[in-house]
From Swiss-Prot:
<dbReference type="GO" id="GO:0030447">
    <property type="term" value="P:filamentous growth"/>
</dbReference>
<dbReference type="GO" id="GO:0051301">
    <property type="term" value="P:cell division"/>
</dbReference>
<dbReference type="GO" id="GO:0010971">
    <property type="term" value="P:positive regulation of G2/M transition of mitotic cell cycle"/>
</dbReference>
<dbReference type="GO" id="GO:0061575">
    <property type="term" value="F:cyclin-dependent protein serine/threonine kinase activator activity"/>
</dbReference>
<feature type="compositionally biased region" description="Polar residues">
    <location>
        <begin position="59"/>
        <end position="83"/>
    </location>
</feature>
<dbReference type="GO" id="GO:1990023">
    <property type="term" value="C:mitotic spindle midzone"/>
</dbReference>
<dbReference type="GO" id="GO:0140429">
    <property type="term" value="P:positive regulation of mitotic sister chromatid biorientation"/>
</dbReference>
<dbReference type="GO" id="GO:0140602">
    <property type="term" value="C:nucleolar peripheral inclusion body"/>
</dbReference>
<keyword id="KW-0498">Mitosis</keyword>
<dbReference type="Pfam" id="PF02984">
    <property type="entry name" value="Cyclin_C"/>
</dbReference>
<dbReference type="GO" id="GO:0005737">
    <property type="term" value="C:cytoplasm"/>
</dbReference>
<dbReference type="GO" id="GO:0044772">
    <property type="term" value="P:mitotic cell cycle phase transition"/>
</dbReference>
<dbReference type="InterPro" id="IPR046965">
    <property type="entry name" value="Cyclin_A/B-like"/>
</dbReference>
<dbReference type="GO" id="GO:0071957">
    <property type="term" value="C:old mitotic spindle pole body"/>
</dbReference>
<dbReference type="InterPro" id="IPR036915">
    <property type="entry name" value="Cyclin-like_sf"/>
</dbReference>
<dbReference type="GO" id="GO:0075297">
    <property type="term" value="P:negative regulation of ascospore formation"/>
</dbReference>
<dbReference type="GO" id="GO:0005654">
    <property type="term" value="C:nucleoplasm"/>
</dbReference>
Length: 492
């Protein structure tokens, strides 16, 4: 009988056994001198007593192969394997991308190749008694073979039948439409009624959609103090980084939604992870690459992003950084984009192109300036629309419709955000690429227009929050008061 070297690996053991059988078949072919009677006796002996493979060590001592388990084999390879450290693509200490949870698993026995006489002569009664227990355990261990979609449907249906949550009445639901639970003391018109025939405007449940957005935006905000918690990162570095991101966004002709999502993803990542200075550009590139795939119809290739970095990073590094960034953020890109809130407010502004263009410029100030980190997007949109209407000289600057379709923001709620925007306009130009972008003709030269107005407004000494400029009604109460304001502005 040929000797087989002892091994604990299942695959190697089975390969060795196949070699032994192959050698036996070759030896039987070569021994042509054996008679037919002897050949029949040998085959009968093989059928009556199955062949036993003995395991012989190098010392010549025969050992019987014991029962092996998959768990023992895997544990042996885990203990013998050398630990490999995966370096974070965006800097920091060596660590895996995500900690894997160790789940203790019961070892699965492999059928032994040695069939002892005692095992072959087991009684039929004991096997019948164990069949019931085996079937019961198999039904618990083996997962259902139903399709996943059918399983999810059945589980959700059973859950709904058990809960039977009572639905609120119409009067109760109307109170949850607004983010702020306060008494509505302003006049407003139902402008969504005009869109009942337009299915794309979803006027039936537009209030529920924005009510969900108002709750979601607070959860997706970054840490407003993360710039001061990191020892290497400074506000000036973020300003340069976002200005470069605006340049790349304009070069690729992407949607505004992609830029807002990229900055939000970048800020949220740096709120929980420390990024080295030489990896900031890689982080911004990966953030815009991820945002474009989420917002755009046709996203640029990763090679274009790597080329825009002047060869600092390869496409493989951009993809690796994207994977790590999404892993840290739990793949949560459900960010309520500020452009949705701006379009909602524009309905109360009669979709005026000028105020909307100026509002987009003022809204992008909130992503390039670090002072706006942590402010709600809906608040920034309402403040941008207020300041845009004030620049264009629209009266009233803020009325009941604008309060309602902005989410319930009054001037007192927007005071801090409006002051920060105004301070940015009167300050020297800090973000060159951002200023050049909105100095173009297609953007109505919004950056130049707003800065010139801010300097004149500051020189006049007027109040940004003049009570005569706003009302809780749809129009100003007194027409004579409106004429006085217009005459005063003309004299100045």
């Amino acid at each position: 009988m040929p000797q087989v070297t002892k091994t604990n690996n299942e695959n190697e053991f089975r390969l060795t056994r196949s070699k032994v059988q192959h050698q036996e078949s070759i030896s039987t072919i070569k021994n042509t001198t054996i008679s037919n009677s002897q050949h029949k006796q040998q085959t009968q002996q093989q059928i009556s007593s199955p062949p036993q493979v003995s395991v012989t060590s190098s010392e010549g001592v025969s050992h019987v192969n014991t029962r092996q388990y998959l768990g023992d084999v895997s544990n042996q390879y885990i203990t013998n394997a050398k630990p490999t450290n995966k370096r974070k693509p965006l800097g920091g200490d060596n660590a895996p991308l995500q900690k894997q949870q160790h789940r203790p698993s019961r070892p699965i026995p492999i059928a032994s190749d040695n069939n002892n006489n005692g095992s072959t002569s087991s009684s039929s009664n004991s096997s019948n008694n164990n069949n019931n227990d085996a079937n019961r355990l198999a039904s618990l261990a083996v997962p259902s073979r139903l399709p996943q979609k059918r399983q999810a449907t059945e589980s959700s249906t059973n859950l709904v039948e058990k809960l039977r949550v009572p639905q609120p009445e119409v009067g109760e639901r109307s109170q949850s439409y607004h983010k702020k639970s306060r008494l509505i003391d302003y006049e407003w018109q139902d402008l969504d009624e005009e869109d009942n025939d337009d299915q794309l405007m979803v006027s039936e449940y537009v209030n529920e959609i924005f009510s969900y957005y108002y709750e979601l935006e607070t959860r997706m905000l970054p840490d407003p103090q993360y710039l001061f918690k990191q020892t290497l990162l400074k506000p000036r570095m973020r300003s340069i980084l976002v200005d470069w991101l605006v340049e790349m966004h304009l070069k690729f002709k992407l949607l505004p939604e992609s830029l807002f999502l990229a900055v939000n993803v970048m800020d949220r990542f740096m709120s929980v992870e420390v990024v080295q200075i030489d990896k900031l550009q890689l982080l911004a590139t990966a953030a815009l690459f991820t945002a474009a795939k989420n917002e755009e119809v046709f996203s640029p290739s990763v090679k274009n992003y790597a080329y825009f970095t002047d060869g600092s990073y390869t496409p493989e590094e951009v993809v690796q950084a994207e994977k790590y960034m999404l892993t840290i953020l739990n793949f949560d890109l459900n960010y309520p984009n500020p452009m949705n809130f701006l379009r909602r407010i524009s309905k109360a502004d009669d979709y005026d192109v000028q105020s909307r263009t100026l509002g987009k410029y003022l809204l992008e100030i909130t992503i390039v300036d670090y002072k706006f980190i942590g402010m709600r997007p809906s608040l920034c949109c309402a403040s941008a629309m207020y300041l845009a209407r004030l620049i264009l000289g629209k009266l009233p600057v803020w009325n009941g419709n604008l309060i309602h379709y902005s989410g319930g923001y009054r001037i007192s709620d927007m005071r801090e955000c409006i002051e920060l925007m105004f301070q940015y306009l009167i300050a020297p130009i800090e973000h060159d690429e951002f200023f050049k972008k909105y100095a173009m003709r297609k953007f109505m030269r919004a950056s130049t227009l707003c800065r010139n107005w801010a300097k004149k407004f500051q020189a006049s000494g007027r109040d940004l929050f003049d009570e005569r400029l706003s009302t809780h009604r749809l129009t100003l109460e007194d027409d004579d008061e409106e004429e006085e304001i217009v005459v005063a502005e003309a004299e100045e």
